C-alpha cells in the first residue's frame, strides 16, 4: 500500500453520490471501506512499520459513523486485529480517537 493507493480510495469515497440512490451509495461505500481494510491488514502482515497504515486508519475512521459501521469496522476489524496482535493499541487508539460517531 502506498500513498497513491490511499489517494485513490479517498477519491472513490469522496465521489460517492449520497443524494441519488442511497442504497447504491451505501453499497459503494462499504466496498471501498472493505478494500481499505484489506489494504490495512495486508500491510500489517507485510510491512508493519509502514507509515501508510496510520494514514489508512485515519481514512477509515473518518468514513465510519453510524452504528452499523462501528460494528463492522470497530468490532469486527480493528478489535480483531488488536486481538491477533497485528494492530498495536496505539494504532487502534488512533482509529478510535478520529471516528465521527453519529446516529443513523
What do the PLM-derived regions correspond to, one by one?
Residues 1-37:
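Short terminal alpha-helical segments
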Residues 30, 34-86:
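Acidic, low-complexity, intrinsically disordered interaction modules
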Residues 80-104:
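Eukaryotic acidic, Ser/Thr-rich intrinsically disordered low-complexity regions
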Amino acid at each position: 500500500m502506498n500513498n497513491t493507493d490511499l489517494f485513490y480510495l479517498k477519491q472513490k469515497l469522496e465521489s460517492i453520490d449520497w443524494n441519488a440512490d442511497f442504497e447504491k451509495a451505501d453499497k459503494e461505500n462499504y466496498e471501498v471501506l472493505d478494500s481499505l481494510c484489506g489494504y490495512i491488514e495486508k500491510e500489517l502482515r507485510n510491512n508493519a512499520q509502514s507509515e501508510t497504515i496510520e494514514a489508512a486508519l485515519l481514512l477509515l475512521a473518518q468514513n465510519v459513523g453510524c452504528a452499523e459501521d462501528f460494528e463492522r469496522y470497530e468490532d469486527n476489524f480493528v478489535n480483531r486485529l488488536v486481538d491477533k496482535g497485528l494492530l498495536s493499541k496505539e494504532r487502534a487508539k488512533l482509529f478510535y480517537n478520529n471516528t465521527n460517531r453519529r446516529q443513523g
